[in-house]
Structure formats: C-alpha cells, structure tokens
UniProtKB/Swiss-Prot annotation:
GO cellular component, one term: tRNA methyltransferase complex
Matches recorded under PROSITE patterns: SAM_MT_TRMB (PS51625)
Protein name, UniProt field: tRNA (guanine-N(7)-)-methyltransferase
Reactions listed under catalytic activity: guanosine(46) in tRNA + S-adenosyl-L-methionine = N(7)-methylguanosine(46) in tRNA + S-adenosyl-L-homocysteine
HAMAP family given in the database record: tRNA_methyltr_TrmB (MF_01057)
Family, similarity comment: Belongs to the class I-like SAM-binding methyltransferase superfamily. TrmB family.
Active site: 118
Residues at which S-adenosyl-L-methionine binds: 44, 69, 96, 118
Function: Catalyzes the formation of N(7)-methylguanine at position 46 (m7G46) in tRNA.
Residue sites binding substrate per the record: 122, 154, 191-194
Species name: Bacillus cereus (strain ATCC 14579 / DSM 31 / CCUG 7414 / JCM 2152 / NBRC 15305 / NCIMB 9373 / NCTC 2599 / NRRL B-3711)
Length: 217
C-alpha cells in the first residue's frame, strides 16, 4: 500500500502532544500517571488509522488504550478522530513497535491487540511478522503475568503461521475462530480493513492467546 505524504502531519502531531505522546521511552513505568488513573492498559500494535482503538476506548471508558503506529501519515488520521472528539482513555505513539520494551516497563500492559498485520508472505521476511518469536518475547516482557494477545486477520497463511508460532512459544490458545463473522462471538469491534475485507466475502480469523504463568510439563 502506497502511503500518501501529508506535509502537515508532524506539525499536527507536535501540536497535540498530549494525545500523540512524544519520547514514549521517557514514560516507561509511568503510563498510569499519563492517564491519571489506575485503570488497566491495552495496546494495539499497528493501529493504522485508529478506528479499532477509538471504538474500543469509547465503548470501554474503564480501560486505557494506546495505539502504536510507525507511519506518520497514517497516525495523523487517528489523531484527527481524537481532535474531533477527544477520549481521555486513548493515547497514540508514532514509533516502531520493535522498540516496545523501551516504551513500557515490565508488566505495565494488560493486553496486546494485533489486527490485520502485514503478512510479510516471503520467507526471508518471516522475522518481520508481528507474531514472530522475538515480537512474542517483547509482548511477554511488557505484559502482566498471564497477559493476553488478541489477534485478527483475513490472511489464512499468516493465521496458520501465528498459531504455530504462539504454540511453539508455549502460549495457551484460549479462543479460536476460523470464521469470526459467522461465529457466536459477541462484542466484536471492527477495524477499517476488517470491514473492507469482510464486505468482499473474506473470512476473518481470530485467536486469543495467553502466556503461561508456569512452564509446560
């Protein structure tokens, strides 16, 4: 996907620095102070234009959310939603998720969302997939003990790879759907991509995976 350059993006982001948090590494261990409360914190890695995080934050004011998106021209669209209607329980980070363990202290996050991540289908790009073992290790480091990953995609190959990667890492798969929109799952909040792909008849895959608190026997 070609991203359209938006020359105003950085100025807009800098103007609303209370929403798009600059230097997030300086906030590690103090995100509850940023939000001003003790509510649990959920993050989305690759938040895109922010529809999912926005709708989640609006539906769940008792939870704090942070959307992480590395592309400035994309995260500014998420910011524009919040300029129109600011939600006190939603912040954004315009950085690469590879640095996740620098942004958050150990055990600071309660849940990680991965929605319609780039599948990186070529074998030589396997390490870039957000469910590759190094990313799983980073999520585990910032999550509370027994923390969860909730993952959705329309890409069967990526889904199968992710199930294998999570299982090999020793995670527990606590929920699995091979056709989310025709399942009994309640309360699904869609992303922009999810709405687009499902309207074309694409099957949506979903898994919830939990880190073990005790080593496998």
């Amino acid at each position: 996907m070609r991203l359209r350059h938006k020359p105003y993006a950085m100025d807009r982001i800098n103007e609303y620095s209370h929403i798009v948090i600059g230097n997030p590494e300086e906030r590690a261990g103090s995100w509850k102070e940023v939000f001003g409360n003790e509510q649990p914190i959920h993050i989305e890695v690759g938040t895109g234009r922010g529809r999912f995080m926005y709708d989640m934050a609006k539906a769940n004011p008792h939870i704090n959310y942070i959307g992480i998106e590395k592309f400035t021209s994309v995260v500014v669209d998420a910011l524009d939603k919040l300029i129109e209607e600011e939600l006190p329980n939603l912040k954004l980070i315009n950085k690469d998720a590879e640095d996740l363990t620098v942004f958050f202290a150990k055990g600071e996050i309660d849940r990680v969302y991965l929605n319609f991540s780039d599948p990186w289908p070529k074998k030589r790009h396997t390490k870039r997939r957000l469910t590759y073992k190094t990313f799983l290790r980073n999520y585990e480091e910032v999550l509370v003990e027994g923390g969860e990953i909730h993952f959705k995609t329309d890409n069967q190959g990526l889904f199968e790879y992710s199930l294998m990667s999570m299982a090999e890492y020793g995670m527990l798969l606590t929920y699995l759907s091979l056709d989310l929109h025709n399942s009994d799952f309640e309360g699904n909040i869609m992303t922009e991509y999810e709405e687009k792909f499902s309207s074309k008849g694409h099957r949506i895959y979903r898994v919830e995976a939990k880190y073990r608190t005790e080593p496998m026997q």
